Every structure is written in C-alpha cells, then in structure tokens.
Amino acid sequence: MTRRYVNIVLAAALVTAAATNAASAQEVVKVGASFAMTGAGFSAAGRQAVAGARLYMQHHGNTVAGKKIELILRDDAGVADNARRLVQEMIVNDKVNIIAGGITPTVLAYGPLVTQAKLATVVMISGASVTTTASAYFVRTSFILSQSSWIMGEWAIKNGSKRVVTLVNEWAPGTEAETAFKQRFTELGGQIIESIRIPLANPDFAPFLQRIRDLNPDTAFIYFPGTQAGIFAKQFAERGLAGSGIKIIGPGDLTDDDELNNMGDQMLGMVTAHDYSAAHDSTLNKKYVDDFKKANNFRPNFVSVGGYDGMHLIYEALKKTGGKTDGDTLLAAMKGMKWESPRGMMSIDSETRDIIQDIYILRVEKINGELWNVEFDKFAEVKDPLKAKK
C-alpha cells in the first residue's frame, strides 16, 4: 500500500467524518482541544489555556444555541506528531465539530488535517505570526509575539532609547521578537548596535553580559522563555549593570504573571509590552482574576485569556449560526467579531483571521507584597505588524 494511497484514504475519511459531524442533528457540539498538559517547557501554557476555557464555561454555562458544549481535552505534550495523531483521532473517532489549538509546532502540524476536514480551529496558545497562514480554517484568540515586540520598538524611540543591543535565544520566537522590534525601532530612527543570539538550553549569560557592558547601549531588548528572564535580570544586577543606566525592555511574556513572583525582586522596574496583565484595571478582569484564582489556586496569565476568549468566540459564533457547525459558516461568523475581554477590547481581523487588540506598556511593581505588571501606557487596536508589512 503506497503512502499516496494512504493519504487519499485518510483525506476521504476526514472529509466524510467532518461532513457527518456538521450535518447531524446532534444536540452536542464537541470542541476538541489538543494542548500540552505534560512535557518539559509547555505544560504551564496548556494548564493556563484549559483553565481559561473552563472558567468561561463556568461563567456562561455549557449550552448555547440550544446545543450542549462538550470540551474534549487531549494531551499532546507539545509534540507535533502527537498533536497530528490526536486531532485526526478526534475528528474521525470523537466526531468533534471544532478544534482548539495549542502551541505553534503542534498547530502547524495539523493545519492540513483541519483544512481537509473543513473544521473551524480556534488557536488559543500559539503566538507565531505565521500560524494563521497554515490553514484558512485557523482563527486566533491568543497573542502575537510580533505585536508586542513591534510596539516595544515604537515605545522605546518615544522614550529616549537611541542605541540598542538585542539579546534573544536562538529559536523561532526569539528571532521573530527580534525582527519585529528591529523593524519598528530602526524605521523610526533608532540604531541597533549589535544583535546577539544565545543558546536556548541552559545559557551562560556571563559572556553576553560582558559584551553588553563593552558595547554600552542605552537599552537592551531581551527575549527568553520561561524563568530565564529572571536569571538574566539577577546576573545583570549582580554584575553591576543595574546601576549603569542601561534599561532592560522586552515583550511581556518575559514577566509572565504566572511566574513573576518566583523570579524575585530583580524584576522590579522591568518594562515590557503585552496584551494582558492580571493587574488590568477593569470590572471584568477583576472578576476574571478572582474567579480564576479561586478555581485554580494560581494567577492567570496571557495564555489563560486566550482560552477564555477562544470559548467566547466559539459561543458567539454558534449564536450567530443558530448552532450550525460547518467550518465555513462558523468562520464567516467569527470574522470581524468584536468584544470586551478581561484583557480589554479585541476583535478578529476579517482578512487574516488574526487578533486585533490593545498592547499595554507594563512596569513590574510590588503591590501588597506581590509583583505585578502595572500598565502605564497603551497602544490601541494593534494588528499583526509582520502581516501588515507584506
């Protein structure tokens, strides 16, 4: 049996399964979520997205447009091959009507599957600009790394930065953050005096800190995953650079609300740009944070609102379609939708199916003994700048 024959049979099975799912007069709408719930590096994101999605269902019930909503969760451990297999199984065996998407490598892996099956897929975690180009059935409610990095470049110019060193990990998110920041910063007249790339795994910051000292920029734009930002800031202070006048800036997942208090006081004063802070001052967000913490015993972060808003998009689209779940009808209902989220006002770009949202400038401050990302500036209705430039 040839690979081509197997692919043809699989494609036929996917299309048949999806058509059957959409056409049936079922009383249940199944949302199949493939997230990393275990595995190194990505399980925290899966935990946050699921908690956000479940909280939305707690707030709004599990029935919409006369249909019961069932959230089916599968753990792909952040592995692309796992995600592709699990999504295929959910389409064919579980007969899901909608897919909820996770981190970038996994959603890119099953893009062709949901395209063949014509299933609306709400991306709740991935932040790569390229994500929504992988399938015409992808729509995003998470975040876009280039949005915050681009805005950070604009804010830096407006606030006196002229000579900047960029320091990022050698991986796709790091290079995307660097690219977006550099494009905006340089087109507004700033100078990048050096772009430094460092290993992703267990980096030794010492030589890079010395290089920053030697270059003597007024600002360092950095981007590292997880708790590495805290390690960097600690070593930055220990080597006397904190008093050198060099400012540290970066995209907001550097100071992730879920990890911030574990990073320590060396994060105080760090300025970032992001779409969400748990300290966002709105009635809706205060209720969201209180209810989230009661349900989960940890603080919500920017990934959690991707899950919460993802379920909102699904619910509101089903209301508009009267419960119809075929992908084309749902996508048409989702495009252009606008609503108030715990993060603020947001909408779905009708052309790119990407998120349009406010980007906040945040400073780490200590309030009542806890570290928080406190908003002090805002850029309204930001699109994905890397798509807008094309």
Question: Locations of the language-model features?
Answer:
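Extracytoplasmic "Venus flytrap"
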Residues: 29-56, 74-80, 103, 167-175, ...
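C-terminal segment of classical bacterial N-terminal signal peptides
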Residues: 15-24
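Beta-alpha junction/loop-to-helix N-cap segments that form part of ligand/metal-binding clefts
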Residues: 28, 44-48, 59, 63-132, ...
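Solvent-exposed, acidic/polar segments of extracytosolic/periplasmic ligand-binding ectodomains
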Residues: 29, 335-390
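Extracellular/periplasmic Venus flytrap/periplasmic-binding protein
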Residues: 85, 128-130, 136-239, 276-287
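Extracellular/periplasmic periplasmic-binding protein-like sensory domains
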Residues: 233-308, 319-321, 325, 365-368, ...
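Bacterial N-terminal signal peptides that target proteins for export
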Residues: 1-9, 19
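Periplasmic-binding protein-like
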Residues: 90, 94-103, 122-124, 165-168, ...
